A protein has these predicted regions:
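Conserved acidic segment of CheY-like receiver
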Residues: 2-13, 18-19, 50
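Two-component/phosphorelay signaling modules centered on CheY-like receiver
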Residues: 12-30, 97
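Helix N-cap/capping motif at the beta->alpha junctions
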Residues: 30-39, 61
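Active-site residues of response regulator receiver
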Residues: 53
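Receiver (REC) domain active-site loop signature in two-component systems and cognate sites
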Residues: 56
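Alpha4 helix (beta4-alpha4-beta5 surface) of REC/receiver domains from two-component response regulators
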Residues: 63, 84-102
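Hydrophobic/aromatic residues positioned on beta-strands within the core alpha/beta folds
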Residues: 80-82
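C-terminal output helix
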Residues: 104-116, 120
Length: 130
């Protein structure tokens, strides 16, 4: 079973903290920008779950996650944000199925792991149907 995840965030400290919490459970790759994330996705994929910080320099998270979905329709995408409100369209993305989940930072490790587990299950269910 593919338990590979890609986490994209411009804050190295966030990526290190995520890796610390999931290293025994998931195989995690990281990137510091949307363009780097796409490169990692194409070269090291497939990934079951891709997480992205909402406000990244360069390519925004919506563009990045849309491009990831173009490459693999089954991948579960998770948005990480410090914004508790969803004025940026996050609720709509969830409702239309374009986004698997939205997590606010700081996110408790247990919640992050559970969301990733659920995303992996959704990925494999989608792959089975495809």
């Amino acid at each position: 079973m593919n338990r590979r995840i890609l986490c994209v965030d411009d804050e190295e400290a966030i990526l290190k903290a995520l890796r610390l919490h999931v290293r025994k459970v998931f195989e995690m790759s990281t990137a510091n920008s949307g363009s780097e994330g796409l490169e990692v996705f194409e070269k090291k994929g497939p990934f079951s779950v891709v997480t992205a910080e909402m406000r990244m320099p360069g390519m925004d998270e919506a563009t990045f996650l849309a491009k990831v979905k173009e490459l693999d329709l089954c991948v579960s995408t998770v948005l990480l944000t410090v914004d508790a409100d969803f004025e940026f369209g996050g609720a709509t993305a969830l409702q239309t199925g374009k986004m698997f989940s939205i997590l606010t930072k700081p996110c408790p490790p247990v919640r992050f792991k559970k969301t990733i587990e659920d995303g992996i299950e959704a990925y494999h269910a989608a792959k089975t149907k495809a």
